[in-house]
Amino acid sequence: SVGGTGGKSPNLPGPVNTPSRFRSVAQAMATVPVATAAMGAVAGLPAGRLVASHFSVMSKSTAQIITAGPAVVERAMGEKKTKDELGGWKVHTKNGTVDNGADDERACIEEIKRFLSFMPDHVNKLAPVIDCDDPVDRCEESLLEVVPRDRRVAFEMRKVIKAVFDEGSFFEMGKGYGRSQIT
């Protein structure tokens, strides 16, 4: 912003939001898993960078993603809102801006570690494979009850996932957004 420089243009090669800055983000996303966390108030370009990821998480206790703070909103709209009401985890996990909310900063890091645990060590390796102690001839009887015969009747897909996936191997992303999808 020129206004913040006393009316003089800063001596930078171009605006902060030049396409080249997001081009590097897109290039990284095509090569490596990109995971981000909001652990405090995030606005502007950092907010764009936060959501330009394969997995994003925000701290329920300390993070907000906002375009303007409570004072600006009150002056412009005449409404008193907290930072959490404007852009806390409840807002952004529901609208799909971020995938998950975690209790605190430590939990954010743990979620990112869990997400990355499904990925290979580097781009030229395959994803990790773990031994399974499930009997190969196991028949999951609960599936007969969970999935209705009438294809027009809704059912709880998470019960199917729990029955089919290895114990503890399902990592859900974006549960608060898009009730008809499970990621």
Per-range role (PLM):
Residues 149-183:
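Non-catalytic terminal/interface segments that mediate subunit docking, oligomerization
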Residues 40, 75, 111, 127, ...:
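A sequence-level detector of short, solvent-exposed, charge-rich linear segments
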Residues 29, 65-66, 109-112, 130, ...:
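Weak global preference for isoleucine
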Residues 63, 142, 178-181:
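Generic structural motif recognizing short loop/turn segments at the entrances and edges of beta-strands
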Residues 2-7, 31, 138-145, 156, ...:
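Gly-rich Lys/Arg/Thr-decorated short loops/hinges at beta-loop-alpha junctions or inter-strand turns
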Residues 100, 104-158:
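Terminal amphipathic helices with adjacent charged low-complexity linkers/tails
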Residues 1-124:
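Conserved catalytic cores of soluble enzyme domains
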